[in-house]
Amino acid sequence: GWTVVSDTTYPGYRAIPIDVMHGYGVMSREVVAQMGAEPPTHVFVQAGVGAFAASVAAAFWLAWGERRPRLVVVEPLAADCHLRSAVAGKPVVVTGALDTIMAGLACGEVSPAAWEIVSTAASAFVALDDRYARDAMRRFAEPLHGDPAIVSGETGAAGLAALLAAQRHAPLSEL
């Protein structure tokens, strides 16, 4: 026998992914504890199936309520299931090769349980070309103003990638 442990829900399989999402929430609760009473204004969070983004949204909603930060959901342009789902008002499956260097986000389909949260909690959805992930990884490795370097992969750099893209493109700066 074996057990599937995934962060993606599907019909007949919900309990374990919800537990995984609760596990993801530990990181967000640590952020809340370190931030204290004053929340940040924005949080850029990567999304593959959306389970991590949903856990971040839920933790911040519980901690700060109406004062919670604006949640900007970031995904690769080649696998933009969250953006397309938001536009359609329902989950949309992205098909094709899903070729992106942000391999951990190349899912093409939202998790239904995560979408229940993300579709309500997100302030914006951003789909990025891979070049922004490369730029973000470089910025992490070679930070400005004496900040410590961070070793990050492409998927982990997605949030910073969206922030850098927002600085460069006027429509994104309105996030």
What is each stretch, according to the model?
Residues 70-76:
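Short internal beta-strands
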Residues 62-68:
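Short helix-capping segments at alpha-helix termini
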Residues 20, 45-49, 73, 128-129, ...:
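Active-site nucleophile and cofactor-binding loops and adjacent substrate-binding regions
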Residues 33, 58-62, 161-168:
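Short glycine/serine- and small hydrophobic-enriched flexible loop segments
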Residues 1-42, 81-127, 133-134:
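Small/polar-residue-rich loop-to-helix segments that shape phosphate-bearing ligand pockets
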Residues 46-57, 79-83, 154-163:
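Short glycine/serine/threonine-rich phosphate/pyrophosphate-binding segments
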Residues 27, 39, 110-175:
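Active-site-adjacent helical/loop segments in soluble small-molecule enzymes
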